[in-house]
Regions:
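S-adenosylmethionine
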Residues: 1-147
Length: 147
């Protein structure tokens, strides 16, 4: 049974689109608690010892995040962590960390990049950490309430 706040029309559409077996896996995933992942900031001095000493509950690395992403076994109260406020790491969905693989592979010289939907900023900080030295990133958020 999927979450009750999902409209029945969407459930029916997804079942037709995915087929019975895939829909069952999809519905099960919707009932599970979401995973928690963080991306370490490679430009911070504390980064090298961060995983071992300061982040509790590390539950594996994000395979496509070049050693910068990890899953946590539970969601800690990030707002109480001074390393979070210092920018040592960013709470970021693991799937969005895949962008780093693309940038590191195909962007090999300095570029000017534009992030048109930049709030709350996780992908912008990730993009900047992956661009070659000498690159410029302009981050923009056109939707006022997302700033």
């Amino acid at each position: 049974m999927t979450r009750p706040d999902i409209p029945q029309e969407f459930k029916d559409y997804a079942r037709r689109l995915l087929g019975a077996e895939r829909y069952a896996r999809f519905a099960q995933a919707l009932d599970e608690d979401p995973s928690v992942s963080v991306r370490l900031n490679p430009f911070k001095a504390v980064w090298s010892g961060l995983l071992a000493e300061d982040l509790n509950g590390v539950d594996g690395s994000v395979p496509w995040a070049s050693g910068e992403g990890c899953y946590l076994s539970e969601r800690p109260p990030f707002t109480f962590d001074p390393l979070f406020h210092a920018g040592a790491y960013y709470v970021q969905e693991a799937a969005s960390m895949f962008l780093g693989q693309i940038l590191r592979r195909y962007v090999t010289r300095p570029v000017v990049a534009l992030d048109l939907c930049a709030a709350p900023g996780g992908k912008s900080t990730h993009i900047r950490s992956c661009l070659p030295e000498g690159s410029l990133l302009v981050s923009n958020e056109p939707v006022k309430w997302r700033e």
